[in-house]
Amino acid sequence: MNSQNPDDHEDTTVVGFEVPVSPVSSYNNVYSSTEDETRDPPAVPPHLQHSLLGNQGSMELAYAPQNVVLNHLYIENRDAPRSVVALGFSHRFRTKFVTVVIYKPVQRRGSANV
């Protein structure tokens, strides 16, 4: 071992086990450009596109939800403004699947309803 001060373990080196010098590029963190900030967020993965809120079929065709959609809160996505909004949540209770759908009136801006 090669050391100037026996109490200083920071500068102690063992032949063959020298710490390599860090490359300068590892400390060169470039800030993100403005084009990164203007991009749209990534699309939802395909397996999260299928929720019971988007199912237009009858209740006889109801399916068991995939594991990845359980315990997620979904909101109805409509282009046209509606007077109510639907929220949905599916979870597993033992061997059954329970889906709760809540309809809430939408308060329009500027309305006098309290």
UniProtKB/Swiss-Prot annotation:
InterPro entries: ASC_dom (IPR006828), ASC_dom_sf (IPR037256), KINB (IPR043554). The keyword Cytoplasm does not apply. Keywords: Carbohydrate metabolism. Residues 40-114 are annotated as: Association with SNF1 complex (ASC). Expressed in rosette (at the protein level). Expressed in the whole plant and at the different developmental stage with a higher level in stems. SUPFAM superfamilies: AMPKBI-like (SSF160219). Pfam families: AMPKBI (PF04739). One of its GO terms (cellular component) is nucleotide-activated protein kinase complex. Residues 26-50 are annotated as: Disordered. One of its GO terms (molecular function) is protein kinase regulator activity. SMART domains: AMPKBI. Kinase-interacting sequence (KIS) is specific for the alpha catalytic subunit interaction and Association with SNF1 Complex (ASC) is specific for the gamma non-catalytic regulatory subunit interaction. Belongs to the 5'-AMP-activated protein kinase beta subunit family. Regulatory subunit of the probable trimeric SNF1-related protein kinase (SnRK) complex, which may play a role in a signal transduction cascade regulating gene expression and carbohydrate metabolism in higher plants. Subunit of a probable heterotrimeric complex consisting of an alpha catalytic (KIN10 or KIN11) subunit, and a beta (KINB) and a gamma (KING or SNF4) non-catalytic regulatory subunits. Interacts with KIN10, KIN11 and SNF4. Interacts with FLZ1, FLZ2, FLZ3, FLZ4, FLZ5, FLZ7, FLZ8, FLZ10, FLZ13, FLZ14, FLZ15 and FLZ16. This is SNF1-related protein kinase regulatory subunit beta-3. The gene is KINB3.
